[in-house]
Design a protein with these regions (language model features):
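Membrane-water interface of transmembrane alpha-helices
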Residues: 19-34
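Hydrophobic alpha-helical transmembrane segments
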Residues: 50-54, 90-94, 123-128, 151-155, ...
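Aromatic-anchored segments of alpha-helical transmembrane domains
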Residues: 60-66, 130-139, 184-192
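Small-polar-interrupted transmembrane alpha-helices in polytopic inner-membrane proteins
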Residues: 122-138, 157, 161
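Functionally important transmembrane alpha-helices
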Residues: 150-197
Length: 197
């Protein structure tokens, strides 16, 4: 039942995340580029500077992995996986790969960052999408009661969002696959921690 619930949620979140970008593309740039490429769904070029990329990936992992260990599980989205063990792995993977990371990457790095970057340049665009990414994640925790924990999570999410945007645009030629893979990995680890704690 949990797997079906997560699959339905994932489809709903994908539809929501794709609606505004699709309408924008349909009205503004439909004749110039395919929708999937416009969002960044293409293979990244071969990396020549792996060391920098690996350092940024490790940095984001070090920021994100402790969160489910230090925050009350009841306020995190992964709460539904608490103590489910191996039986919850399929649902956790749907949640992590399709239900959260893909819609968020489409909306923040595929749409917001790329559209703002076209108009204002990389730095203001990446800062803006990172702030929005952190703020949205903070809004989801706003009712948790502990404003300090919420603020820390928002700041960590902003830094992670900035790093993911930087990796996409500066190291992956605008491909969304890099940040989606990292984001899915982070969410999978968080869900696995919930499954077995």
């Amino acid at each position: 039942m949990l797997l079906i619930h997560q699959a339905i949620n994932a489809i709903g979140e994908l539809v929501l995340a794709l609606t505004i970008p699709f309408l924008w593309w349909l009205i503004v740039t439909r004749r110039q580029v395919r929708f999937d490429r416009w969002l960044g769904f293409f293979l990244p070029p071969v990396q020549r500077t792996w060391l920098t990329t690996v350092i940024v990936v490790l940095f984001t992992l070090l920021l994100a992995i402790p969160l489910p260990l230090i925050v009350d599980h009841g306020i995190l989205a992964t709460f539904v996986f608490n103590h489910r063990g191996f039986a919850g792995i399929p649902a956790a993977l749907v949640y992590a790969i399709v239900g959260t990371s893909l819609p968020e990457e489409i909306l923040f790095r595929g749409f917001l960052l790329k559209r703002l970057q076209d108009r204002f340049g990389f730095l203001p665009a990446n800062l803006t999408q990172a702030i929005c990414f952190g703020a949205v994640n903070g809004l989801l925790l706003a009712g948790a009661g502990n404003w300090l924990v919420t603020l820390i999570i928002v700041l960590i999410e902003m830094v992670i969002g900035y790093c993911l945007g930087w990796l996409n645009e500066r190291r992956s030629g605008g491909s969304l696959y890099t940040s989606w893979g990292i984001h899915a990995l982070l969410n999978t680890v968080s869900a696995l921690i919930a499954l077995f704690t």
